[in-house]
Amino acid sequence: MNDSQNCLRQREENSHLNPGNDFGHHQGAECTINHNNMPHRNAYTESTNDTEAKSIVMCDDPNAYQISYTNNEPAGDGAIETTSILLSQPLPLRSNVMSVLVGIFVAVGGFLFGYDTGLINSITDMPYVKTYIAPNHSYFTTSQIAILVSFLSLGTFFGALIAPYISDSYGRKPTIMFSTAVIFSIGNSLQVASGGLVLLIVGRVISGIGIGIISAVVPLYQAEAAQKNLRGAIISSYQWAITIGLLVSSAVSQGTHSKNGPSSYRIPIGLQYVWSSILAVGMIFLPESPRYYVLKDELNKAAKSLSFLRGLPIEDPRLLEELVEIKATYDYEASFGPSTLLDCFKTSENRPKQILRIFTGIAIQAFQQASGINFIFYYGVNFFNNTGVDNSYLVSFISYAVNVAFSIPGMYLVDRIGRRPVLLAGGVIMAIANLVIAIVGVSEGKTVVASKIMIAFICLFIAAFSATWGGVVWVVSAELYPLGVRSKCTAICAAANWLVNFTCALITPYIVDVGSHTSSMGPKIFFIWGGLNVVAVIVVYFAVYETRGLTLEEIDELFRKAPNSVISSKWNKKIRKRCLAFPISQQIEMKTNIKNAGKLDNNNSPIVQDDSHNIIDVDGFLENQIQSNDHMIAADKGSGSLVNIIDTAPLTSTEFKPVEHPPVNYVDLGNGLGLNTYNRGPPSIISDSTDEFYEENDSSYYNNNTERNGANSVNTYMAQLINSSSTTSNDTSFSPSHNSNARTSSNWTSDLASKHSQYTSPQ
């Protein structure tokens, strides 16, 4: 008796299963995993009745096994159905820890922004500052307040515009360090040393340049480093840090505003050295953006950076697939030539709907600043004083605390619900709150009841802003754009933010204050903010695409495929579904690694789902939930543990489908590391397939054509990669395992293409 028969007999005795040694539907006696031939370790057949049988083929590789379902009863035309599923044990789980820690740490740049913004609100109301810094030694005039507050934003506007030239030339990481340790610190030193209004303004302009660079590069760095399922929350942490900075500045200023000396303003300003030093020194230990390395064709460094950020070994197939996807998309875009600042405003084949994308980013940044939020944070203390509110400092502090608290649910909602719903809901609530404040302020005047109502709705407005527009705007404006122009577009959006900020800060005192050459609108200004909120909601509805859950590269495909923003959520789901609905006959990861596959009616998470099969982990699955045409099986992984599988597919067919062990597409990156490309090619490469099926939302298109389309996409990518990679990498820090010499980019891509051809050629 051979080993296989012994194995079968033992399994019959232990498992009370009917042994079977007829695997006629299995082609050959070996299974192929990553093209290494391995004999069967054991096999058995479980017969549930006379017409159905379920066969499991175990391989000597403990990480893989194949399950097949066979209907022994011929259909009407004599056909027999066999469904084959090749499963593997879970790959090592990705670690989100480093991506989260890196994203939150660089958000300290937002803390600097918020701290400096909130500081000026308190400093201009300090008794010592009014007496010794104000030119007339008693108070600041409307024009002086306007210049002192707004000129920080003037500096940030120019800082944001120069940011892409520095970050694309020297990297995201050095740019953040330089702007923090050098530019911002110089401006801060001038503010600390100032004994008059002029030097204080000059210092704020220079500090503003540093903050402007930070505001353009930090969200960009966060977007390029984060995993797609965490990107929204991580970028939103930038806004959360801004709110914390505002709160801390208010607390510090309350502690020093009554001091009768220069320390009243120098202490809160000087503390900015601490925050800037933390960011500058900490950046030394963080990796550069992997997409920047791809931009510079330093692929080995990009792989190392991804390894650090994803918590995966450098040879992990998921990490390498992500690297290939980034490289493919960038090379496709770069094949159209170098990009300039004007390309940010040009739609082309490699940058679909680019005009709409840049308009969207600029518009939402502008409406964020014109929402009324900075009026409260810049002039809140003075406004509360003028409307009869007692202890305006305390009310201002409470508003900052609300801002911090409600930024936290916003970090959750942006990835859970999506960008569009959050922006739309937030805009509506903000509009209502602003209009109520205006109506109450105009109709009731300076009464106690009116003050309480206004404070309550101001807090409601701040809560809505913090949870929605505060963070989501930075998320959208950082992720909308192709890699070739991403830094430039992000900088333009940040510059738009600061330009509107500057304009609002400059003109608001003239609109609100009472006196000559002013409009004396008072609470009526909230009618303006409320009206702008309504316009913002309309713009979001018709311009903002839903990008939740997509990689930065898949967002390009979204804009290429989705005809408009209104139905972009539908197309977003299509793209995400296509990424998961690859043929079930190919290698798949277990449910621990596929968390976004969706839910069935019974609320069990499927491993993979398509129109024909729902392969579900049924650990703990209630027996009464199994339908009559469902088939359940327990697969032994060889270590004593079982994986419970249920297949809801009917076991009849009109054509014979023999079980095959399909080859897993295997790509060698030229450094001895393998990559499974089983599900799809790089998304930005235009597929050879027709789009009619895609546009008709026929899910069978994905199921039946994914393998073919994936191969076409990857093959197209390989050809483009070879043609476009004429430059060489200067990186010699990484030596491939099979070659001690550093390889050029062309060698790297040649190996990639040749290995791909080797493993995807007809067998």
From Swiss-Prot:
Native organism: Saccharomyces cerevisiae (strain ATCC 204508 / S288c)
Glycosites: N136, N385
Keywords, ordered alphabetically: Cell membrane, Glycoprotein, Membrane, Sugar transport, Transmembrane, Transmembrane helix, Transport
This protein's name: High glucose sensor RGT2
Self-association state and partner proteins as the record states: Interacts with YCK1. Interacts with MTH1 and STD1.
PANTHER family according to UniProt: HIGH GLUCOSE SENSOR RGT2-RELATED, PLASTIDIC GLUCOSE TRANSPORTER 4
Family membership: Belongs to the major facilitator superfamily. Sugar transporter (TC 2.A.1.1) family.
Gene assigned in the entry: RGT2
Cellular component terms (Gene Ontology): cell periphery; membrane; plasma membrane
